[in-house]
Amino acid sequence: MEAPEFVVGFPTLGDVWSAWMERHCRVPDRHQRGAPFREYDWQFWCTANHGRVRPEATHDPEHPLLNQAFVYRRSQVIAPQKMGKGPWTAARVCLAAVGPTEFAGWAQVGDEYRCDENGCNCGWIYPYLPGEPMGRRHPSPLIQIMATSDDQVANIWRPLVSMIGLGPLKDLLLPRGEFIRIVGTSGDKDMDRIDRVTASAQSRLGAPINEAFFDETGLYTKSNKLIEVFTTMRRGAAAMGGRSMETTNAFDPAQNSAAQQTQESQRSDIFKYWRDPDLALKRPDGKPFSFQNARERRKILSYVYAGAEHINIDSIEAECLELMETDSSQAERFFGNRLVRGGGSWLPPGLWEGCHASAVASAA
């Protein structure tokens, strides 16, 4: 499988974040269950960008910059099925709860992040490089995970609970059924917790959260009223200097979903990760590759799954071939990472990009 050049040449908390997750989080399932959770290349690239610090950022312990210390206020990941979005998001939730997510200045010689100074008894120490951004725990975290239903939110919640039980985080994160208690210092029962939000469970909507995680935002639409929930949670985070991350499969451009609105936003403080094969892979005549062509399909799959070492392209392609016998659009959307309309027809080349560009020009 060809791998892209994921080169991190900017100041970021992503290095300490990734190292922290490897030390504290565990692989939740499969044959490696219980092993240290190590990010795939594409995951680290997204983590590094979410943790990208503004070079001019300064640190005042009494008045921290919070989300304004970072280049990106929020992130979006559009990726095909089985890329590892759920377990990775679970690890990022753990990090947001008890890891060094806040910018805490620039390291000098000898500076370290020490778990024993941050409520964790595992003994881990991360030595910073001089000039590297440093991190600290949030003093009173309130985190929400949103999905369309209980079954959908389980894509994150299930690996999250497993990660906690399999490693050192079981002393810091205490699952309590519908929420997870974070062992902290605030003593506030309404803070220091991780909550789940769905279409039918919105009792804590509007809370002053510091981090929000949205699963399958391609399914949040105006008709199911989840765009309203999506924006309400983002407002709650913005008021507290918080941040958010959304993950999804390729969206249906006929639905104007939350994922589509994020992708079409012109805000420069949103990090977007989407390996769109129709923009990157073209024939000599300029037309995108066809999923019906065996050789071109293989190149599409290799491109969109780049950086995911656990993926077996032969297995993915075998499932695609069977799906294509009855519903080619599913194969193209969920595995080919392409925009496919609900009616099953793939968008003509350049149509979505052209409409998007026209809308932006009209709004200017």
At which residue positions do the language-model features occur?
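Phosphate/NTP-binding elements of NTP-utilizing enzymes
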Residues: 1-364
